[in-house]
Amino acid sequence: MAQVKSLAQSLYPCSSQRLEHQMKLQILKNSSVTCNDGTPAGYYIKESRGSRRWLVFLEGGWYCFSKHTCDSRYESMRRLMSSSNWPPTRTGTGILSPQPEENPHWWNANTVFVPYCSSDVWSGSTPKTDQRGHQGALN
């Protein structure tokens, strides 16, 4: 493993710098972007100076579709519906790992981890309209 680490570090000119291994929590200031329980949404970021590569990871977590399923989900999987207990930092594992032995291809990338807390399968909240039909070309 020491050989893998040495090889990976030699590929990056800034690898001799002290690397930050923790992803830091950033809470969004836009009050319309919230988790199921109304707590603010956010993301974790680990910047790697000198790297132009970015890895953005959207956490999975299924969904709820009624008051009953959402209440049940809140009792059993609260972390997927609220940011209230998110820690201020996280350490990535697997593809998010900052360790070259564990993640030889992406260890030095800028990393963004977006926790899933809205139970909407990342679909957002676009308002419904009464408009039907094909819009066609705009030119």
UniProtKB/Swiss-Prot annotation:
Q: Which InterPro entries match?
A: PAE/NOTUM (IPR004963)
Pfam families associated with the record: PAE
Any one GO BP annotation for this protein: negative regulation of Wnt signaling pathway
GO molecular function terms noted in the UniProt entry: palmitoleyl hydrolase activity
Highest taxon above the source species: Eukaryota
Q: Which PANTHER family match?
A: NOTUM-RELATED, PALMITOLEOYL-PROTEIN CARBOXYLESTERASE NOTUM
* Protein family (similarity comment): Belongs to the pectinacetylesterase family. Notum subfamily.
Q: What does the UniProt record say this protein does?
A: Probable inactive palmitoleoyl-protein carboxylesterase.
Q: What is this protein called?
A: Inactive palmitoleoyl-protein carboxylesterase notum1b
Instruction: Give the organism the record lists.
Output: Danio rerio
